[in-house]
């Protein structure tokens, strides 16, 4: 499942969202995936439990988090949700706080998680200017166009 296709088909983009805590921010992304029938509601608690156990493992770069759980924790099919926050939040990551871009990922197996999910995110943000381009997006179509341009350049 391609990032662009998943976001478009699942209508799982939320821009300039308001959240008080990192948990609220994660829930916005998971709720988009629940609404699209990509994950079960329990996926949210699984992510919170993993953070309690391992720390903020999904904060990948300055400003960027990729919340995700394990396939057996309620994943029905592979999919993505993209959330930008109006106000960046602390995720308690010593290097990469605060976070204002979240790409929530659900993968049906570890191979899909590594090869499909993470590689597409790395590809999108290989050009560091895409962080600011994404923050500037105000419509779902602008996000999808940015992803298309990035894929065309790759």
From Swiss-Prot:
Residues where Phosphohistidine is found: 68
Pfam families in UniProt: PTS_EIIA_2
Gene3D superfamilies: Mannitol-specific EII, Chain A
Domain comment as written in the entry: The PTS EIIA type-2 domain is phosphorylated by phospho-HPr on a histidyl residue. Then, it transfers the phosphoryl group to the PTS EIIB type-2 domain.
GO biological process, one term: phosphoenolpyruvate-dependent sugar phosphotransferase system
Induction text: Induced by L-ascorbate. Repressed by UlaR.
Protein's organism: Shigella flexneri
Function per UniProt: The phosphoenolpyruvate-dependent sugar phosphotransferase system (sugar PTS), a major carbohydrate active transport system, catalyzes the phosphorylation of incoming sugar substrates concomitantly with their translocation across the cell membrane. The enzyme II UlaABC PTS system is involved in ascorbate transport.
Protein name per the record: Ascorbate-specific PTS system EIIA component
CDD domains noted in UniProt: PTS_IIA_fru
Principal localisation: cytoplasm
Catalytic residues as annotated in Swiss-Prot or TrEMBL: 68
Organism taxonomic ancestry: Bacteria, Pseudomonadati, Pseudomonadota, Gammaproteobacteria, Enterobacterales
Chain segments annotated as transmembrane: none
Chain ranges of the PTS EIIA type-2 domain: 6-150
